[in-house]
Amino acid sequence: SKYSIHSYDDSVRPKAEGVYNSPYQIKDYDLGDLTDLLLKSNDVLKGNSKIVTATSMARIVDMNMKYVCSNGSNLEQNFLYVGPGFRAIAQDGNIIQSRSYTDQCQQTGMEVFNEEFIIKKCESICKEAVELLSAEECPTEKMDLVLHSDQMLLQIHESIGHALEVDRILGDERNYAGSSFVNLEDFGNLKYGSDLMNITFDPTIKEEFASYGFDDTGNKASKEFIIKEGVLQRGLGGLESQER
């Protein structure tokens, strides 16, 4: 087409065949039992008179994807995303604090709805939300910072994940999700961090939110370095975007 932004090449759509299934121990569940557990957990979240709002939820997504292409590809992927979410909001006068726990970024089964674990977690959420009401304010000064793994996950997601989305770098999503400070000429050259920084993209790791056997164009999942010894190697995107 005279209006195409890039010429098509068959190499960006390799033939693929196979099956991928999310790992899980338990898939079936009783809706009544699950509802009872959420109601019970909500009562535990409201275990202090200073708790003004409590929320308990369950997220269950069971998805089947069938991919057939004229290049001979024929593959099937079955994804099961399961996870609970709990939140308590505490108030004392004009001071309001909240504490939460969400475990929804994973592929697993109904085994995550373990009552003993959930009740203990909700007790902690309630207790910590109330404790925050009387906690001292974080001091305003320059200091060394040690990040917990949960916060480090978010830091990597925002500072590296979004910034290296190839569709952002190419400008395809500029009006929708924004662009990136990374330029095409930065690949193989940009010093992203110290020599100790090594970051990989690996969808073959089990139980992760982004685990899969094949991407949306049928490309087989594999472990790839995106930053090696501090230097940017590649972006995040399908073969067609990478070719551009």
Question: Which residue stretches match the model-derived regions?
Answer:
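C-terminal, non-catalytic macromolecule-binding modules
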Residues: E229-R244
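Active-site bordering "gate/hinge" segments
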Residues: S1-F214, N219-S222, K228-V231
